[in-house]
């Protein structure tokens, strides 16, 4: 990922460099328009690489916040969960549906204004490619079936449960007493029978 400056407009853009064989990410990303997803601005190919030029999100990943010792409040965790559910509703209701495939704190960016963005669509697939062998996800967040080479909406929800659990961190037990519905939701997301 590179940071570039648009000389004509005087604004920064993020530029993602990919091997040309991975250009399906650009084709999929080009179709998306949601307030919690970075906007794709342009696409170009050169030699063995393709470049996705997109909106620059100035902020940090949720993983960076965790590494810095930040403790998310229960309200922040519930808000993050709500935003992710809205993005999943948008992706899963498309025709054909899109499965994100790699939800985790390092793929979620938050601006200083607390606006959340889901980034990195490298593992996303259309539902008709649900047995796409390259979509493995990240250990600790990916649903068990992803390691068998299949993915579904339930796989995304499994990763959501694991992500929310990680955001609770050391406060997990007090948070689950404070908001039992959150605990039930996390358990429901991570039940292996649904995946």
Predicted features by range, described:
Residues 156:
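Conserved catalytic-loop aspartate of Hanks-type protein kinases
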Residues 62-72:
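AlphaC helix of the protein kinase catalytic domain
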Residues 132-145:
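Conserved activation segment of eukaryotic-like protein kinases, specifically the C-terminal portion
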Residues 80-81:
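Activation segment signature within eukaryotic-like protein kinase domains
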Residues 43:
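Activation-segment/catalytic-loop signature of the eukaryotic protein kinase fold
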Residues 47-61:
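Conserved short submotifs of the Hanks-type protein kinase catalytic core
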Residues 92-110:
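Catalytic-loop of the protein kinase fold
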Residues 2-20:
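ATP-binding glycine-rich loop module of kinase domains
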């Amino acid at each position: 990922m590179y940071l570039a400056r648009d000389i004509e407009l005087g604004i920064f853009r993020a530029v993602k460099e990919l091997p040309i064989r991975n250009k399906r990410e650009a084709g999929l990303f080009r179709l998306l328009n949601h307030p919690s997803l970075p906007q794709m601005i342009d696409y170009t190919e050169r030699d063995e690489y393709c470049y996705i030029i997109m909106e620059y999100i100035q902020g940090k990943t949720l993983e960076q916040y965790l590494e810095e010792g930040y403790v998310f409040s229960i309200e922040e965790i519930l808000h993050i969960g709500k935003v992710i559910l809205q993005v999943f509703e948008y992706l899963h209701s498309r025709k054909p549906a899109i499965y994100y495939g790699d939800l985790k704190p390092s793929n979620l960016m938050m601006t200083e204004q607390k606006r959340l963005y889901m980034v990195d669509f490298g593992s996303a697939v259309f539902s008709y490619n649900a047995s796409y062998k390259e979509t493995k996800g990240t250990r600790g967040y990916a649903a068990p079936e992803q390691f068998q080479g299949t993915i579904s909406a339930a796989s995304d929800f499994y990763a959501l449960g694991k992500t929310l659990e990680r955001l609770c961190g050391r406060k997990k037990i007090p948070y689950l007493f404070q908001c039992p519905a959150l605990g039930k939701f996390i358990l429901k997301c991570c039940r292996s029978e649904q995946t």
